[in-house]
């Protein structure tokens, strides 16, 4: 394969999802043998977040084409392992590179409930991607990735200052919140903070620690019930998230 370059436009065109994954694996293995592949694609299955240094984004802005690529190292130490594990757990996160805007959230409850309520309010946008980061601790890694590729975003996180938390937990929560706020680029992103999490926003009251089992199911069950009244504060935040 020495000195061989493969140019392939939209390989996903005639492939089903399973074939796309197999094709991507074959291309990846071929590069180890010396083949250089240049692939243009609109499929997230041909992208691995962990290989962000090999990505190049072409974006049309008015009458011009802007190109974004990042060859440096965004992560160090344990961050590399954690970030790669996040991708392996949920490879759908690669779709963030195709989004007009990315909505970063902590977990499943946020993703499920925000999607439902945004559709209920008529503000949901299919060109936006809601990316579940796995935890608040992982959000900074995604922010750095989005900043590097100039992708617009909003970070949605929990304040986590519940009355039942001890002093150490409150200090850790505050530190994580400030870290997120400092990383958000003024030109690309913004942040929305839940008080203290989306469950308290939904129920409009403080929640006991024991009430946090099976969160996604019970949260969605609550908001889809007939007669549920969406708190005005939460409504405003959802509208801001999807603006």
Task: Please tell me what each predicted stretch does.
Residues 1-92:
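Switch/communication elements of ASCE P-loop NTPase nucleotide-binding domains
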Residues 90-104, 108-243:
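Acidic, Mg2+-coordinating catalytic modules of nucleic-acid enzymes
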